Amino acid sequence: MSLIDPRAIIDPAARLADDVQVGPWSIIGPDVEIGEGTVIASHVVIKGPTRIGRHNRIYQFSSVGEDTPDLKYKGEPTRLVIGDHNVIREGVTIHRGTVQDRSETTIGDHNLIMAYAHIGHDSVIANHCILVNNTALAGHVHVGDWAILSGYTLVHQFCHIGAHSFSGMGTAIGKDVPAFVTVFGNPAEARSMNFEGMRRRGFSAEAVHALRNAYKIVYRKGLTVEAALSELAESAAAFPEVAIFRDSIQASTRGITR
């Protein structure tokens, strides 16, 4: 029995693995590649060039690989690349890249993108991230591994969201969020570190203690960023987790959320 509903529209130039399932009324355009074990529900639109890996599930009414609304976009061939084991829930919109950046929007592996979230052009979502309902990322946003963006989080273009960070519901992020930091509010403010996330992922007590002290150095001692980074050097040499925190601050181009 065919795994593609006869009411779906599949362009002859699309390339689907033999066991890909496609529901009724979905439309898959040319230059779309979908890997084995992936399930496309009903009423999904996928436009190429788009590469979707293995064992993903895309729910109804999602728009995947559409042109960017960036006014500079003139129809250049740009891409969307999605890895493996991602869940993309109802009504999600994901746009392809632009030639002004890498020409590619990238989503890694094992991510949960919940209903009505938006991922803008040229954004990069790493692995094991959660974007809760109605989260919206502008163009060129980078989200690190294990980050969680709670519902209605808004992220300004070019912001970097660090690994293991967390945003509260309705947060408006306009600056970079360092790794492990919890932010909340409009505009976003740093509140603490994501200790619950560290606990769930099995961080050692020593690493958590070192990160707690690192947070105090950056956010509680009244130091400049440069002075705080200098003071973190010894701890960063001893704990890779502190090095990740320090490096995410050092790499910031928009300034960090304070």
UniProtKB/Swiss-Prot annotation:
Main location: cytoplasm
Localization (cell): Cytoplasm
GO cellular component: cytoplasm; membrane
GO biological process, one term: lipid A biosynthetic process
Taxonomic classification: Bacteria, Pseudomonadati, Pseudomonadota, Gammaproteobacteria, Pseudomonadales
Record-stated family: Belongs to the transferase hexapeptide repeat family. LpxA subfamily.
Keyword Repeat found: yes
Reaction equations catalysed: a (3R)-hydroxyacyl-[ACP] + UDP-N-acetyl-alpha-D-glucosamine = a UDP-3-O-[(3R)-3-hydroxyacyl]-N-acetyl-alpha-D-glucosamine + holo-[ACP]
Pathway(s) served: Glycolipid biosynthesis; lipid IV(A) biosynthesis; lipid IV(A) from (3R)-3-hydroxytetradecanoyl-[acyl-carrier-protein] and UDP-N-acetyl-alpha-D-glucosamine: step 1/6
Enzyme class: transferase
Subunit structure: Homotrimer.
Tree of life domain: Bacteria
Annotated protein name in UniProt: Acyl-[acyl-carrier-protein]--UDP-N-acetylglucosamine O-acyltransferase
Pfam (any one): Acetyltransf_11
Spans through the membrane: none
Enzyme Commission code: 2.3.1.129
Gene3D superfamilies referenced in this protein's UniProt entry, alphabetically: Hexapeptide repeat proteins (2.160.10.10), Udp N-acetylglucosamine O-acyltransferase, C-terminal domain (1.20.1180.10)
Keywords: Acyltransferase, Cytoplasm, Lipid A biosynthesis, Lipid biosynthesis, Lipid metabolism, Repeat, Transferase
Species of origin: Stutzerimonas stutzeri (strain A1501)
